[in-house]
């Protein structure tokens, strides 16, 4: 977790010496792998296909780094967070955002100096122009008109200068409070600090550090809660940011459903403190014998209650979940969210099967959990909910439709009925969706082998360049179709790693060979990074289901039957008969084939709504889309029968799917 990247010399020296003294605590665990080269069982073609290697980072000090990251987490959670809450309450969000811009403007001397030392003349000129514009027109940096003029930040520091001069790779280092670093960057932080004007006025230096820590602590802690292991992606992203140095790349964009899908990054809450205002509670899940957490936002007066289920790997406090919760809350509804069955939290605490991926079971587990949540909220706040609406996004939308399709059977089990079922950008075929994600991840195979590494670095370079500035909804993201495919596939491949490790921590099938300890995880991540989604389904899920689900055998026929049962066509009858099912999707969503769209229109008729563009989730941040969805949902809710609105809940409902 990184709360601030600027350093104070004395504390940096002390912490650096401390960490170097602990450097003997190195990891000795090796990555081991199962040999699939001679495998001829179901799905063998996926195990023998060429794959792009997942970005890996050497971390010889991992045990020490993880221990220090744990100290940092405790400090942030129990010291910084309470103080920061007071600061954020007193200082409005708009003011804090402008203070951040002012603090950033003060970094100009170090930035321009390091651009010059690296012979980046154009970048130094652009940084100087930014500083002049923002200092004058922008009122000492309180505003950022330079970005609107096309002058983007060019942040460089002495660590990057040392890299440019030849010190390319350096041992990763985590320093409490100061965050991810390396030996090279730690040394570079000393001249960095002296190049920062605030250093020479202690109140300014302390104020800047306090502001940045207070402003970022909730987001940082949320990353720890949302991810199965926040340390791993933070280390990889930091190292890529420090090592990828691409000055020239093609600023090109293809207009396609895939590139439009990248606009899903804009699906985040407008109020950055919205997540911090969530109430969190737990319900008991019989299948696991554990408590499952849920988050909710309650209206002061009686209102509809919206149940949210996020997409693949999604957590109840993830950015897209919070965005949808905020939209529903601002529209007058109370909102409750649970994590997706493919997220570590649900795998550990809410799943009847240890391995997610079998949609009928996953959807049933969600329904059981929501039934428990509904009963809990109704008991705490009687008379506060005028109706109940289930909304799912992406894979959560597929689960929502399975719940809707099995509504009559669920009622016999005492599971909560809903007045409206809203599916946002669902897949119809799980198999098609997983194949698409695997294909996207391997999109760079289209590059010639000798230039593949450079091309991938260029893609990372674009991402890192854009991350330095303001990203506003509506701006064009400069990625080609192939580049967008790779970025989407890469993001979901990391979710797969979390999924595999979380499921194997609960029930080890013996597929993985690498030992894991509390402070050494990197070797295991290297092993699981070599599995695709289709390999996961055939190496983990299929053998597991064959011993637990009637009709599933561990062969090609069993694999085919599994995917058929995970297809929406398996619940076609229930969907046709349920007038309260709504689907909102885009015609150019990569998860939907032409025959899938035709099938949805045939089954749902006017209840299936398709927008002409937006890709997968790429237009859900747009208020015009919100208005269309809200109008249709309200109209459907008004026509809901009383049995759904006032349905009773059996607290002893079974927790296993039929």
Which ranges hold each PLM region?
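Conserved alpha/beta-hydrolase "acid-adjacent" motif
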Residues: 590-596
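N-terminal targeting leaders of membrane proteins
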Residues: 26-121, 207-252, 643-658
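Catalytic histidine-centered segment of alpha/beta-hydrolase-like enzymes
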Residues: 614-625
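N-terminal cap/lid segment of alpha/beta-hydrolase-fold proteins
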Residues: 253-301
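Short, surface-exposed "cap/lid" segments of acyl-processing enzymes
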Residues: 297-344
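Short beta-strand/loop motif that positions the catalytic acidic residue
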Residues: 583-585
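Alpha/beta-hydrolase active-site loop
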Residues: 355-380
């Amino acid at each position: 977790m990184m709360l601030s990247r600027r350093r104070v010399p004395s504390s940096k020296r002390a912490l650096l010496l401390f960490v170097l003294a602990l450097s003997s605590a190195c990891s000795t665990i090796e990555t081991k792998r199962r040999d699939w080269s001679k495998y001829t069982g179901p799905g063998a073609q996926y195990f023998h296909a060429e794959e792009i290697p997942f970005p890996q980072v050497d971390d010889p000090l991992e045990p020490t780094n993880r221990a220090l990251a744990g100290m940092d987490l405790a400090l942030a959670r129990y010291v910084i967070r309470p103080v920061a809450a007071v600061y954020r309450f007193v200082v409005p969000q708009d003011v804090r955002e402008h203070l951040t811009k002012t603090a950033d403007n003060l970094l100009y001397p170090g930035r321009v100096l390091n651009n010059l030392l690296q012979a980046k003349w154009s970048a130094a000129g652009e940084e100087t122009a930014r500083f002049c514009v923002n200092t004058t027109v922008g009122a000492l940096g309180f505003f950022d008109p330079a970005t609107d003029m096309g002058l983007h930040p060019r942040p460089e520091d002495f660590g990057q200068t040392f890299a440019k001069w030849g010190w390319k790779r350096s041992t990763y280092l985590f320093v409490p409070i100061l965050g991810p670093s390396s030996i090279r960057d730690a040394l570079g932080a000393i001249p960095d600090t002296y190049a920062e004007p605030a250093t020479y006025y202690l109140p300014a230096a302390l104020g800047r550090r306090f502001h940045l820590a207070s402003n970022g602590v909730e987001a940082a802690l949320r990353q720890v809660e949302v991810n199965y292991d926040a340390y791993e992606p933070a280390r990889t992203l930091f190292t890529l940011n420090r090592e990828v140095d691409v000055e020239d790349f093609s600023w090109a964009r293809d207009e396609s459903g895939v590139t439009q899908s990248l606009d899903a990054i804009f699906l985040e809450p407008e109020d950055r403190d919205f997540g911090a205002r969530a109430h969190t509670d737990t319900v008991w899940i019989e299948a696991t014998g554990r408590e499952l957490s849920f988050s909710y936002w309650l209206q002061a007066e009686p209102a509809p209650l919206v149940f949210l289920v996020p997409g693949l790997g999604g957590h109840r406090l993830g950015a897209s979940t919070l965005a949808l919760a905020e939209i529903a809350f601002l529209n007058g509804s109370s909102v409750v969210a649970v994590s997706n069955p493919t997220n570590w939290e649900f795998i550990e605490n809410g799943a009847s099967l240890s391995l997610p991926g079998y949609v009928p079971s996953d959807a049933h587990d969600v329904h059981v959990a929501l039934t428990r949540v509904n009963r809990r909220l109704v008991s705490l706040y009687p008379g506060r909910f005028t109706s109940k609406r289930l909304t799912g996004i992406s894979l959560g939308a597929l689960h929502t439709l399975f719940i809707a399709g099995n509504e009559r059977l669920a009622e016999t089990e005492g599971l909560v009925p809903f007045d409206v079922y809203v599916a946002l950008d669902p897949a119809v075929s799980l198999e098609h969706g997983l194949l698409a994600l695997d294909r996207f991840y391997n999109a760079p195979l289209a590059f010639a082998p000798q230039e593949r590494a450079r091309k991938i670095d260029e893609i990372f370079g674009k991402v890192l360049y854009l991350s330095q500035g303001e990203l506003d909804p509506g701006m064009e993201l400069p990625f080609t179709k192939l580049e967008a495919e790779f970025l989407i596939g890469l993001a979901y491949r990391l979710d797969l790693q979390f999924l595999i490790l979380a499921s194997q921590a609960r029930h080890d099938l013996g597929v993985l060979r690498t030992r894991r300890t509390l402070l050494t995880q990197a070797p295991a991540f290297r092993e699981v990074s070599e599995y695709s989604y289709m390999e996961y389904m055939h190496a983990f899920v299929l053998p597991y289901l064959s011993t637990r689900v009637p009709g599933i055998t561990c062969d090609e026929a069993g694999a085919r039957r599994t995917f058929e049962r995970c297809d929406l066509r398996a619940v076609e009858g229930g969907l046709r008969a349920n007038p309260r099912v709504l689907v909102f999707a885009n015609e150019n969503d990569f998860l939907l084939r032409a025959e899938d769209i035709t099938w949805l229109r045939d089954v749902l008729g006017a209840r299936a709504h398709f927008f002409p563009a937006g890709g997968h989730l790429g237009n859900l941040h747009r208020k015009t889309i919100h208005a269309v969805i809200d109008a249709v949902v309200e109209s459907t809710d008004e026509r809901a029968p009383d049995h759904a609105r006032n349905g009773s809940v059996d607290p002893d409902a079974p927790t296993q799917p039929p």
